[in-house]
Design a protein with these regions (language model features):
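Glycine-rich phosphate/pyrophosphate-binding beta-alpha loops
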Residues: 125-127, 155, 201, 312, ...
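Glycine-rich loop(s) and the adjacent beta-strand/alpha-helix scaffold that form part
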Residues: 116-162
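An anion/pyrophosphate-binding glycine-rich loop and adjacent beta-alpha core
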Residues: 3, 17-18, 53, 144-150, ...
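Flavin (FAD/FMN) cofactor-binding core of flavoprotein oxidoreductases
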Residues: 62-69, 152-161, 304-321
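Core beta-strand elements of the Rossmann-like FAD/NAD(P) dinucleotide-binding domain
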Residues: 88, 106-116, 188-191
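A conserved short coil-to-beta-strand element within the FAD-binding core of flavoproteins
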Residues: 88-101
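A glycine-rich dinucleotide-binding beta-alpha-beta segment and adjacent secondary-structure elements
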Residues: 88-91, 265-345
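Conserved N-terminal/central alpha/beta ligand/cofactor-binding core
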Residues: 2-86, 91, 195
């Protein structure tokens, strides 16, 4: 919890139910009942009642006013103590049952008798925090089907050398579209993107990754519109204006006025230019080629980064084997599930924590 939201803890997202459900590409409808009974406003009221002042930022993201995730975890610990909840610092090995009902949790140190157990072990992302995937093993041993875990909200790997050449470059206010092998758009949004040594990352890419669920036998490309505020005709006029104002300058200089400096050589090469051409020597066809690259900067995606680098784990306990109104197991009486151990996942922005609170 203390590392969420870059250490600030994006507690929830202050949006309506429809927006919330639309932000959960992984089995969002299964969560309808839970998110109706415990809404983002309920989450905010809960923490404010515990003494944590909250604020709403861009994109309706909710954070502690202090910008410290520790305020959230400290408040939860205080509430546990107030309610005299017993802490057992142990590792659960398995859940014991008798006649199809929970009887105890067996740990490494002791056994803990119980008539009801909530399995809230999270996924397999961020293994350095202790996420081992034990919950999947425990649930599977009790007869539950586990949808194979994979990374969601994860950076994406691109083919070629263009991304390494632009490593560290962050683009704002760009439009991104991801196409599958049939040239069908599977994701489209506007925002920020980051080039890395392996490919692309940033908020837009992380959200896009949640939609890319089939990599075997599928081919994805990501198209970046570097000038979404201008259509091709207006962008062509903008390029023509820049050339007219600086006819004797090299195209490398002109391009650096259109895109960040480290991106200019890549854009020019894709347009069939070297950058040494005089601006006034550019033909109409060359200018149009440049506009096409600016509006349709395309990269081939080869796959996601490892699940250990993902913000969220997709996959987990199959939701068809869980009662949506109670999160109770349909296999074992007294067994319940909460959070990321279930096969549910959402976009970045506080949605995944809201799922955790609601379930």
């Amino acid at each position: 919890m203390n590392i969420t939201g870059k250490g600030r803890c994006n507690v929830t997202n202050d949006c309506d139910r429809e927006t919330l459900l639309a932000s959960i590409p992984g089995n969002g409808r299964f969560l309808y009942g839970a998110l109706t009974r415990f809404t983002p406003r309920d989450t905010m009221a809960f923490f404010e009642a515990l003494g944590v002042s909250l604020k709403v930022e861009r994109g309706n993201r909710v954070f502690p006013v202090s910008d410290s995730a520790f305020d959230i975890t400290n408040a939860l610990e205080r509430e546990l103590k107030r309610r005299r909840v017993r802490w057992a610092r142990d590792r659960a090995l398995h859940i014991e049952t008798e006649n199809g009902a929970v009887t105890a949790v067996q740990g490494e140190k002791d056994a803990y008798p119980a008539q009801a157990v909530i399995l809230a072990t999270g996924g397999v992302s961020y293994p350095g925090t202790g996420s081992t995937g034990d919950g999947y093993r425990i649930a599977e041993a009790l007869g539950h089907t586990i949808v194979p875990p994979r990374g969601s909200l994860v950076p994406l790997v691109c083919a070629g050398e263009d991304c390494p050449a632009m490593q560290g470059l962050s683009l704002r206010n760009v439009a991104v579209t991801v196409y599958n092998g049939k040239k069908k758009a599977v994701f489209r949004d506007f925002g920020e993107l980051l080039f890395t040594h392996f490919g692309v990352s940033g908020p837009l890419v992380l959200s896009a990754s949640a939609h890319l669920r089939r990599w075997e036998g599928e081919h994805y490309t990501i198209e970046i519109d570097l000038k979404p505020a201008l259509d091709e005709q207006k962008l062509d006029a903008r390029v023509l204006r820049d050339i007219g104002e600086n006819p004797n300058r090299e195209m490398g200089t002109i391009a650096a006025g259109l895109v960040p400096h480290s991106m200019a050589p890549v854009v020019l090469r894709r347009a069939g230019l070297t950058g040494s051409e005089k601006a006034n020597s550019l033909t109409k066809e060359q200018r149009r080629a440049l506009v096409q690259v600016l509006k349709h900067f395309t990269l081939e995606l080869t796959g996601p980064r490892p699940v250990s680098e993902a913000i969220v784990t997709a996959g987990g306990v199959k939701v068809g084997e869980v009662t949506p109104n109670t999160m109770a197991s349909k296999r074992v009486r007294g067994l319940f599930f909460a959070g990321e151990v279930l096969d549910v996942d959402a976009y970045t922005g506080g949605f995944n924590l809201q799922i955790a609170w609601a379930t």
